[in-house]
Amino acid sequence: MLSHPMKLLFFVFALSALLAAATPVVEVRDYQQFSRVSLINFISFNKARGGDLCANGKKTMCCGELKTFDKNILGLLDGLLTTVVGLAGEILKPTGLVGLECVPITLLGNGGLSDVCKANGVCCKDLTLRAAINVGCVPINIL
């Protein structure tokens, strides 16, 4: 008959073997491919439940350029402000980045977001000037 310490040792080894056999082993060789699949699954889940990749009323956009909001950008947008009513308060107190040459990302396509957007994937406020300039953008990882 086994002594108490031997029983405990046997129990620990048996439990370790059981847990090791029950734990799935996942080997990821291509991390970028894994992250793309994870992002696509996340987006698909959000779309299926009626959500969006971007929260708080922001829109998923693909922008050709991202700029920090400074006086040069304000000068560029100054002419546009006269034609857009109600945006002056938002422009004078900006948060985030300004996205230039932006288009909304609505379809994933066969290859995922990286095929749809080869530039900068961002979440922008639902505030667009002249359909290509977005205010209050935050970069997202599209790979």
From Swiss-Prot:
Signal peptide: 1-22
InterPro entries recorded: Hydrophobin
Source organism superkingdom: Eukaryota
Keywords: Cell wall, Disulfide bond, Secreted, Signal
Keyword Chaperone: no
Main localization of the protein described in the UniProt heading: secreted
Subcellular location: Secreted; Secreted, Cell wall
Cellular component aspect of the GO annotation: extracellular region; fungal-type cell wall
GO molecular function: structural constituent of cell wall
Record bears the keyword Signal: yes
Disulfide bonds: 54-123, 62-117, 63-102, 124-137
Pfam families xrefs: Hydrophobin
Family, per entry: Belongs to the fungal hydrophobin family.
Subunit (UniProt): Self-assembles to form functional amyloid fibrils called rodlets. Self-assembly into fibrillar rodlets occurs spontaneously at hydrophobic:hydrophilic interfaces and the rodlets further associate laterally to form amphipathic monolayers.
Its biological purpose: Aerial growth, conidiation, and dispersal of filamentous fungi in the environment rely upon a capability of their secreting small amphipathic proteins called hydrophobins (HPBs) with low sequence identity. Class I can self-assemble into an outermost layer of rodlet bundles on aerial cell surfaces, conferring cellular hydrophobicity that supports fungal growth, development and dispersal; whereas Class II form highly ordered films at water-air interfaces through intermolecular interactions but contribute nothing to the rodlet structure.
Protein name: Class I hydrophobin 20
Organism: Pleurotus ostreatus (strain PC15)
The organism's taxonomic lineage, starting at the top: Eukaryota, Fungi, Dikarya, Basidiomycota, Agaricomycotina
